[in-house]
C-alpha cells in the first residue's frame, strides 16, 4: 500500500484546494469459510499483527478496520471527541499525547488509545466475548477499529466471520443463514472489492466464497480470488491449474499466498519474515508463477484496483477544477490591476460606461439580457405595444351621450334657434375628446424615463464590473446620469403637452382624411334616407289624410311603383337643395367651407350642412322611430304653475328627426376627426420622446460625465478602492495559482504507474 500513499497525499492537497469531498476508496471485504485464512490475508496487507488468530471459530463479529494515514508532523495535533458512530466513521481527528509512530483507537472505548498492537488484539477478543459470549457465539454487531499510521492509506478493510454449515457451541441452528445474510450485507455495497478466500487444500469448485460473491457480482467486476495455504497441499499435487484459471476463471485474477502457520504465530514470526519465506516457497514450487502470486503481488493488485477507481473519479474532479479556475480568472480580471495612471483609468471607465449605456439602447451591448426585454428593445415595446394599445383603447365617443351633444349644440346657438348645427359645438366636443389623449402620452414619457433609469443599473451589474472596484466612482456616475435624465423629463413632457395643444389649437376640417370621411358619410346618409322614404312613405301618408300632400308624392296604389318613388325622392331632394341654397346665400350654416358658389357647385368640405335640412314628410316618418329620452321641457306642463326659480325637472320625450340626425352627424364627425388626431399623436409622441429624451441623453452622456467627473481634484477620491478589494485580489490570485497546481497534480496522477 505504500505506493498509493504519495498519490493519496497529492489528491488530499487537491481536495483541500477545490473544497470537494475526499474520494472514498472502495472497502475491501474478505469472505470465506472458517479457517480459510481470511484474517491472515488482512494482516499481511496491513503489515501488523493485530487480529486474533487460532483454530476453529475465531472471528465471531465483523471487524471494520479503518486505516488512517497521518504524516509524521501531524502526530498529536488534535484531540477528537468521537462518540457518535456516524461521526466517528468519517472522522480523521488525531489525538495529542501519542508518543508511538502508530496507534489504534476503538469506538466502544471512546478516546482510549492503544500503542501496543498486542493490546489491540486482546481488546478485540474481549469485545467479541462481551457481546457474543465465550462459547463460539456469533454476533452481527461490528467492532470499529481505527489504525493511525504514516505507512497506510485511507482505506477500510472488513473481516467477516467465516461461513459454516453446522452450529457449534452457543451458535443457533440457523447460523449458516445468519452468517450468509451478514456477508451479503457488506458485499452488496457496489463500492466494495470482494476478496474471495479459498484454501488451496480444498476443491475450488466447492468454494462458498466464490459462490456468494457471484450472487452480488455476477460479472466479476469487483471480485478477486485468493488461494491460501499453498504450502499445505497434498504431496504430489499443486495449484497450477487453479492459479492459471483453468478450473474456474475469475475476471480480476486468482492470486495464491502462503500464510503463517500457528507454530509461526506462537514463535512470534513477523509479517516481514513470513513474506520473505513465502517468496522463497513460490520460487521453488511455482517458479513460472512466482512473480504473479504472493502477498506483495496481492497488495500491488489491490493498489491497481484502487488506482483505477481513483482515475475514474478524476475526470469529474478535473472538470470542477477547470470551472473554478475560469471563475477565479474572471473574478481576478474584474478586480483589475492596481491603478498606476489614475487620470487615464478614470477617463477609460467613463468612456466605457457611456459606450455600454448607448450600446444597450441600440441593442449592441456585449451582455444581452435573455430573461426579459431591456434597453432599446423595451423602449420599442413601450412605443408600439403599450402606448399604441392604450391609445387604441380610448373610445372616440367615450364620456359623451346624446344629452351632452344636444346641450352643446343648443349652447352654441345662443338665444336664436339654429337652422344648422353650429361648427362651434363640433369643435367644443371634439376638443374635449382630443384632450383625453394627453394623459397616456405623458405616461409613455414616464415609462421610457423609467427604462433609461433601469439601463444604468444594467450597465453597472453586467457591462462594467470594473466599477465595483471604485464604489465612489460608481455612485458619482449614477448620480450624473440620473440628473441628466431628470433634467430632460420636463422638457420632453412639455413637448408632448405641446403636441396635444397643437391639435387642440386648430381643428382642420379641410384635412384630406376628414374631407374624404365627410363625403363618404354624406353619400351613406343620403342613400339611407332615400331607402327609408321609398320603404315607409306610403304607410305614413295614409295615416295622415287630413294633411296636404304634394301631388308628386300621392301614391297611385298602396305600394308605389319604383318610378313614382324615384320621382318623389327627386322632388324632395330638389326642394331641400333649393332651401339650403337660399339659406346659405343668406349667410347661415357652419363656416365658409360649406357655402355653395354662384355656379351652383356642390361644396368640397363641410358638405354635411345640407343634410341638416329635412322635409316635412321625412319628419313625419322619423317621429315614429324616435325613442323617448330625458330632455329639458320647452314649455310648462299643463295644470302646474310655473316658477322660474325652480330647477327644471327632466322629462322623457321623443327626439325629433332633426335632433336624432344632428346627434348622428356630430358623433360621426367627432369619431372621424378623433381617429385622425389619434393617428398623429401615436406617430409624433414616440418621435418627440426619442429626440428630446433618448437621443439627447445618448449624444450628451459622455460629455456630461467628463465635464462633471474628469477633474484632477476628484481623481483620488473617485478612484479609491473599497477596503477589502486588495485582499480579495490577493485571495483570488492565490486560489487561481492553487487550482493550476491541482490541475497539474491530476495530470501527474494519470501518468502514475504502480506496477
From Swiss-Prot:
Tissue occurrence: Expressed in all tissues tested (at protein level). Longer isoforms are preferentially expressed in brain.
Region of interest called G3 motif, as start-end residue ranges on this chain: 159-162
Region entry Disordered, spans: 536-610
UniProt entry tagged with the keyword Membrane: yes
Post-translational modifications reported in the UniProt record: Phosphorylation/dephosphorylation events on two sites near the GED domain regulate mitochondrial fission. Phosphorylation on Ser-656 by CAMK1 and PKA inhibits the GTPase activity, leading to a defect in mitochondrial fission promoting mitochondrial elongation. Dephosphorylated on this site by PPP3CA which promotes mitochondrial fission. Phosphorylation on Ser-635 by PINK1 activates the GTPase activity and promotes mitochondrial fission. Phosphorylation on Ser-635 by CDK1 also promotes mitochondrial fission. Phosphorylated in a circadian manner at Ser-656. Dephosphorylated by PGAM5. Sumoylated on various lysine residues within the B domain, probably by MUL1. Sumoylation positively regulates mitochondrial fission. Desumoylated by SENP5 during G2/M transition of mitosis. Appears to be linked to its catalytic activity.
BP-aspect Gene Ontology terms: calcium ion transport; cellular response to hypoxia; cellular response to lipid; endocytosis; heart contraction; intracellular distribution of mitochondria; mitochondrial fission; mitochondrial fragmentation involved in apoptotic process
InterPro entries on file: Dynamin (IPR022812), Dynamin_GTPase (IPR001401), Dynamin_GTPase_CS (IPR019762), Dynamin_N (IPR045063), Dynamin_stalk (IPR000375), G_DYNAMIN_dom (IPR030381), GED (IPR003130), GED_dom (IPR020850)
Effect on the protein upon substituting residue 38 to A: Defective in GTP hydrolysis. Tubulates spherical liposomes. Impairs mitochondrial division. Decreases the BCL2L1-mediated induction of synapse number and size of synaptic vesicle clusters
Position(s), cross-link Glycyl lysine isopeptide (Lys-Gly) (interchain with G-Cter in SUMO): 545, 548, 571, 581, 613, 616, 625, 627
Residues the entry annotates as binding GTP: 32-40, 228-234, 259-262
Stretches for region G5 motif: 258-261
Record's protein name: Dynamin-1-like protein
Organism name: Rattus norvegicus
